[in-house]
């Protein structure tokens, strides 16, 4: 039988195509993939911009043809995937931008089973990935625990041998006479070893330095004319509550001292040695910077310079002293390493946390990380059709991609499940990624449902639906199991033989949970609120919001409303308790 590729020889075309200025229904019957993709690409533009094209598609069988393309299923072939994505985009454009009659025709063209299958596939993928991620995380924790226990035993053995050796050395050293006692001033607390030539360096005379508890003041020129000796004694003065006595030659300007710089005793005990360096302005001989011979551990957190601090008092700080410090550092040509200060950033407290961060940075694979997001303050009746979608069928994975013409829309974040499977490189996983529903497909499905579900006369299509066999991914999900044998191809059942026993509202309600993206949760909440609309054609009665019940009111205001959202109605307390598991996610106060 000849293919249905209508050629146009007079314009040198192998088949009939849809362009941005010409719509031809025959182009949708083309069996060749490439010209059909070109036609669908232009049709996606026409369905967005032309209301007449949307109306024509509802009467010439164009919508039915697009739905048939969708029901053929997705394939691993890139061209087939592109064709499916473009057809889906066209149907969404028709349903979202069309009138009530156009939306009714989209539902009557059997588009609801396609949406139900997409949502069900996505939920199954999430459950599968969450289960695998939890098992892998548990195995990783057991491995880390075993890895930590083994070095601990070896360290205890080495420590015991080292203690024995040191005790033997102490026994031999006790035979020597004790060393001569050397008097050390009480304000010197440096415990580090000093070079031999440091004894010849005379220490400057030290005046008793005290300061009030609130603020300490001293001359700002004391930093300027200090001699830059290669080695200084590091000391710290005890704080007292008196005004320091200073010479007039030291400088007349006074500079306020901040509490975070004046209280080194608040530092952790592990850094007392570093904190005892004379960097605080309360120490008269403390230098404003550290020399190159002072070794600071790499793992310590450097305190920002004084110019980055904000004043803790209402007065303005004088920056001349700080400028002179910066000039000294620049002119000396030596590296400036500030000592450790109070922790004001996100620090790592212990070795366990540090190792966890290092492991997370060095780990090249992506684990499942579900972000807890909420969507507050959104109106239930507000619709937004400006979410960006792939008109050309390409997969959008840009973290900073914003919705078109919508500044308030959050950025589209790549799915953590796609990142999880992308790093597990095997044949089964790569084939599964091609058939896995994308987040934009789920988002457009929920968006289309939000527009067509508000018509109560179409509610039976949503509550009595089915799944499309060629779109289901149960076989691909079974291939992801570890040690799974190849699944034999089973002859699929005909779709028209399947019973309509699927209610789409429970599937949509699962997307109102907080671990989904904000856009998904928003559109899912809109769909669920449409379920609570009253049917004007039946006298304004409402249906019980518990999908397992489905009872209708016999008269208006028979059922009681939810006290929180004042929108949903339940026929009894039992139905309300049964539905609260997911209703709490979309139960918003009016």
Swiss-Prot record:
Positions with a binding annotation for Zn(2+): 562, 565, 583, 587
Keywords assigned by UniProt, alphabetized: Cytoplasm, Metal-binding, Sporulation, Zinc, Zinc-finger
Biased composition (Low complexity): 152-167
Phenotype of the disrupted gene, per the record: Produces partial defects in sexual reproduction and suppresses an apsA deletion mutation. Changes the colony morphology and inhibits sexual spore formation.
Pro residues compositional bias, start-end: 202-211
Disulfide bonds: none
Keyword Membrane: no
GO MF: zinc ion binding
Biased composition regions of type Basic residues, renumbered to the chain: 139-149
Any one GO CC term of the record: cytoplasm
Entry superkingdom: Eukaryota
SUPFAM superfamilies xref list: HIT/MYND zinc finger-like (SSF144232)
Zinc finger (MYND-type): 546-587
Segments of this protein annotated with the region Disordered: 133-220, 297-344
Biological process annotations from GO: establishment or maintenance of cell polarity; positive regulation of flocculation; sexual sporulation resulting in formation of a cellular spore; ubiquitin-dependent protein catabolic process
InterPro entries from the UniProt entry: MYND-type_zinc_finger, Znf_MYND
Location(s), subcellular: Cytoplasm
Sequence similarity: Belongs to the MUB1/samB family.
The protein's role, per its UniProt record: Involved in determination of the onset of polarized growth and morphogenesis. Plays a role in the regulation of branching in hyphae and spore formation.
Name assigned to this protein: MYND-type zinc finger protein samB
Organism ancestry: Eukaryota, Fungi, Dikarya, Ascomycota, Pezizomycotina
Gene this chain is encoded by: samB
